[in-house]
Structure formats: C-alpha cells, structure tokens
C-alpha cells in the first residue's frame, strides 16, 4: 500500500456487490457541502457513497459525521508555494495519482464526481486513467484550477452559475431542502411592520471587514429602526461585540447559526461575502443582499459570483477597500427605507434559484454511470475493473525500479520516470472502454 494514501477502515457499504459513487471534494466548505448534499440524495436512493479527500483537511472532520467512508491522500495545494516546492510538485502529484488509483481499485466506484479541492486532482486523473465515468461540478463562476484541468476529459461538466465553461450544464449549487422550501418573498415580506431585519453573514471563520464596516455604517445613519443579527465566527466574536458596543448599535452577535432557514426567513436584507454556496442560499430563500466579495479569493472568484446576482438586480456589490463603511452607509440608507426595492431584489434572487440542484446532479451521475436508479451488476460479473493482478504486479515492479533510480536525479527526471511508470502501467485501462461500470470517460 502506498504511503501516500490512507484508507478508511470502514467498508463502503454492507454489501460488497453494490458499487458506490465516489465524491472528490475538500479543503473548504464551498467544495464539501455541495458534495454532502448530493451524497444525501444518492444514499436516499439506495446508492452507497465513498469520499476521497486530503490528509488533515476539513473533509476529514465533516464527512465522517455523515457516516460516509473517506480515504485520504497526502496532497496539498500548489498555489503560493516556493520555487523549491513547485519544482518537486510533479513527483508529488504523480505519486498522489498512483495512490488515488489504489483507492479507486479498492472502492470500485460506478462513477466519480469532482467538486474541487486538493485531492480532486489526483483522484480525477486516476479515474480517467482507470476508465471511470468522471464528472465535474464547479461551484464558482471563475473555475478553480483542479476542475479546470479535469473538465478537459470529464464526461459532463456541471456548474453552479452559467458562463464558467464551454459546453457546461448550469445545474446550480445544492442547498439545504429547508431553505429551498421557504415561502415566496411576497408571502414573507409584504405587510411586515417593525424594525428592518438585517442579517450579516461572515462565514464560519468570520469576516473582520464586516465586523468593522457594518457597525460603523449603521452608527453613521443615526441609529435607524433596525434589528441586526450578525454571524461572526467563534474567533471574532469578542471583536464584533466590541465594535457594535462602541458604535452604540444593538445587535445579536452569534458565532454560528444552526438554523439558516429560519435566519433567512427572518431577514429583510442580508450583508455578506459572495461564496457560491451562500449565494445559492440567498437565491433559494429569495432575499436581497449587499455583497462584499473577499478581496483575497483565488482568481477573485467571489466578485465573479456576485456579478451574476447584481446583473439580475438581486444584489448590490461593494468592493472591499478603505471606503467600504462609507459606501455601505449610502447603500443601507437607501435600502433600509425602501421596502419595495428590497422586495424587488428578493423576487429577482428567487428567479435565479435552482432548488433541485442536488437531485439533478444525482440524476446525471447515475445516467453517466449507466445505471439510472437500478442496482449495478455485481463486481465479480463485470469484465475487469481497473488493472488486473498481472498488470498490478508489473506496475509495482516498474515503480520499484523507478524508486531505485531516484538517487542523484533531478526532480524533473524523477517526475518523468514516475509519469512513464504510471502511464505505461495504465495504458490498457485508458484504451479499453468498460473497465468501470458505465464505460470509459
């Protein structure tokens, strides 16, 4: 067994005769939670699910809570690394691909879907080499590096927003069923009296810029008739409470909101970042928003996400800079006193919603697996999975030979040998359709 893969001791399913769907996702909640939503749908249909993630990453804590077996790879991101680490990247990636192949041969998935993250790259490449039906779901309008690469040979490319890839299928981002089930904006907002309810979402880690800008902007408005509920993350809770106290603004400051459906139902307006999952929830709930994209987001993808809602008049976009508090004050001055505008934004958001995204993604996965909702053929009835024992022996021999040649060679030469070993040992899997259920990718 490769030291680059850590295999779960939990079997994929009580019956070894049922092939699972493998989910590749990790690193951030934006990748993990959509995967969990789809996993819930698949399992409700009787389809087992297995997960491939990265050692020590967020998915290793979240996924087991849902009783989903997870295997992990020793892999990290490449962006922002020093030159020495980047030079060694090809070797690490090839080893991770080989380790991922080991996991896939053990799990024998009927289909593999990438939601992005560190382990998704090696996992997706291994799926391609072994002929597994590979799909990609990209949550953001600006595609991540991993999904951008995998999209080149994926069977289907699914997106949360239109305009991410050529030939994409914009199915939306999965949201929790209780959020999608909220009444229409008119049923919630028309005829409301009392304070305007402003929901501020800083994400699980909090957003210091919102902790500072929102109290400052509200204080500058001269204490309007507003009720504030601010989700700030555990680490920044004290900081947020101090900011509101200094601004003499009453607010309920919470590190975490468990019932987001109730929070959206309560809100007249939301001030938040522009992560893909958050925007999908805003649309599903039908609530207007003021979006402040995270300035350091990779490829500025949050701004691209926000522009989609702004283009539909469902949100206002404010850039994160030194003048944010002043501009937020100006925007709030208009929105807090204009219920018709808030309702219009909420209705516009609701028209963008795709509440059945998780169901549609599950449908497409099973279509590409060639199984629909039917139970797949037994593993032993299929004509070969991945590579046979003889090929595996050959691969291991070649790998040992390559390992013996590492000493004294440059990183590039070592990576070249690894690539040659990997591709030679999997050539039959690439050229022969049907090694996985559903055929080659």
From Swiss-Prot:
Binding positions (UDP-N-acetyl-alpha-D-glucosamine): 28-30, 140, 176, 204, 257, 302
Gene Ontology process terms (BP): carbohydrate metabolic process; cell division; cell wall organization; lipid glycosylation; peptidoglycan biosynthetic process; regulation of cell shape
Compartment list: Cell inner membrane
Keyword Cell membrane: yes
EC number: 2.4.1.227
Top EC class for this record: transferase
GO CC, alphabetical: plasma membrane
Family: Belongs to the glycosyltransferase 28 family. MurG subfamily.
PANTHER family, sorted: GLYCOSYLTRANSFERASE (PTHR21015:SF22), UDP-N-ACETYLGLUCOSAMINE--N-ACETYLMURAMYL-(PENTAPEPTIDE) PYROPHOSPHORYL-UNDECAPRENOL N-ACETYLGLUCOSAMINE TRANSFERASE 1 (PTHR21015)
Protein's name in the database: UDP-N-acetylglucosamine--N-acetylmuramyl-(pentapeptide) pyrophosphoryl-undecaprenol N-acetylglucosamine transferase
Species for this entry: Xanthomonas oryzae pv. oryzae (strain KACC10331 / KXO85)
Gene designation per UniProt: murG
């Amino acid at each position: 067994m490769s030291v680059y893969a850590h295999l779960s001791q939990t079997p994929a399913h009580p019956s070894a005769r049922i092939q699972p769907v493998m989910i590749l996702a990790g690193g951030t909640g934006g990748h993990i939670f959509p995967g969990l939503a789809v996993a819930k749908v698949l399992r409700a249909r009787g389809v087992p699910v297995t997960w491939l993630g990265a050692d020590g990453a967020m998915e290793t804590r979240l996924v087991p809570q849902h009783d989903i077996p997870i295997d992990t790879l020793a892999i990290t991101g490449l962006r922002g690394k020093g030159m020495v680490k980047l030079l060694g990247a090809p070797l690490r990636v090839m080893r991770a691909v080989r380790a991922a192949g080991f996991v896939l041969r053990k799990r024998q998935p009927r289909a593999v879907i990438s939601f992005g993250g560190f382990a998704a790259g090696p996992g997706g490449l291994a799926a391609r080499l072994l002929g597994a039906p590979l799909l990609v779901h990209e949550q953001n309008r600006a595609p991540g590096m991993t999904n951008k690469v995998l999209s080149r040979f994926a069977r289907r490319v699914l997106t949360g927003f239109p305009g991410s890839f050529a030939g994409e299928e914009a199915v939306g981002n999965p949201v929790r069923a209780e959020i999608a089930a909220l009444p229409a904006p008119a049923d919630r907002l028309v005829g409301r009296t009392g304070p305007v309810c402003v929901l501020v979402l800083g994400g699980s880690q909090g957003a210091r810029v919102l902790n500072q800008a929102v109290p400052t902007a509200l204080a500058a408005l001269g204490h309007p008739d507003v009720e504030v509920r601010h989700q700030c993350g555990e680490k920044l809770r004290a900081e947020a409470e101090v900011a509101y106290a200094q601004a003499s603004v009453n607010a309920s400051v919470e590190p975490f909101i468990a019932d987001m459906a109730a929070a959206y139902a309560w809100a007249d307006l939301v001030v938040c970042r522009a992560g893909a999952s958050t925007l999908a929830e805003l649309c599903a709930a039908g609530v207007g928003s003021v979006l402040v994209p995270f300035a350091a987001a990779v490829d500025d993808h949050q701004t691209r996400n926000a522009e989609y809602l702004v283009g539909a008049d469902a949100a206002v976009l404010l850039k994160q800079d030194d003048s944010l508090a002043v501009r937020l004050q100006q925007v709030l001055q208009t929105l807090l006193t204009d219920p018709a505008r808030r309702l219009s934004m909420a209705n516009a958001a609701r028209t963008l919603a795709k509440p059945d995204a998780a169901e549609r993604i599950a449908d497409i996965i099973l279509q590409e697996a060639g199984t629909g909702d039917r139970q797949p053929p037994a593993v032993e009835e299929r004509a070969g999975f991945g590579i046979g024992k003889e090929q595996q022996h050959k691969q291991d021999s070649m790998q040992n030979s390559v390992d013996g040649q590492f000493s004294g060679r440059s990183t590039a030469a070592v990576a070249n040998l690894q690539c040659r070993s990997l591709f030679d040992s999997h050539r039959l899997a690439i050229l022969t359709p049907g090694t996985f259920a559903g055929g080659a990718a």
